């Protein structure tokens, strides 16, 4: 799970290629949530939102009940049309009238990138390439600086300089 606007390609690549995760996890699918009221503006302003919709197996449309009257119907039609254009294969559910049940959300089978659009396959391939390149640079980044013989490791986080991320591995249950 990512929170807010995150590029799904690095997360998917990690889950599908990291040996530790492969041994412990099985990726069944991707669910993304789209706000029916603000979704168009979000898709217009954030490439990550477009990617989230494009890779999803399930799209959950929230706040549908707030779209009332003729204007609301037009907004709902427009956001649904946009989502269908970005990802015609995803199952679209709303939170209205209990449509997004656990069974509908989580019964989807294994994630299969070969069944995704060419853009999604391209994003995943680019992530695999970038991850491999960074790994190769880290393996070879060794030098003597200021009398200290050590390795430098690139920050593989692709955020700006104000956002940092890290991970750690435990061998026992926490």
Identify the residue ranges that each predicted region occupies:
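C-terminal accessory "lid"/substrate-recognition subdomains
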Residues: 51, 58, 66-174
């Amino acid at each position: 799970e990512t929170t807010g606007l995150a590029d799904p390609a690095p997360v998917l690549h990690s889950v599908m290629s990291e040996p530790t995760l492969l041994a412990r996890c099985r990726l069944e699918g991707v669910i993304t949530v789209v706000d029916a009221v603000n979704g168009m503006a979000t898709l217009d302003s954030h490439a990550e939102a477009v990617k989230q919709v494009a890779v999803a197996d399930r799209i959950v449309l929230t706040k549908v009940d707030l779209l009332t009257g003729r204007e609301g119907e037009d907004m709902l039609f427009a956001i649904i049309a946009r989502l269908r254009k970005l990802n015609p294969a995803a199952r679209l559910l709303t939170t209205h009238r209990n449509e997004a049940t656990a069974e509908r959300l989580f019964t989807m089978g294994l994630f299969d990138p070969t069944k995704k659009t060419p853009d999604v396959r391209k994003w995943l391939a680019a992530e695999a390439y970038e991850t491999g390149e960074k790994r190769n640079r880290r393996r070879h980044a060794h030098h003597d600086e200021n009398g200290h013989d050590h390795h430098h490791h690139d920050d593989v986080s692709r955020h700006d300089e104000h956002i940092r991320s890290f991970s750690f591995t435990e061998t026992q249950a926490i």
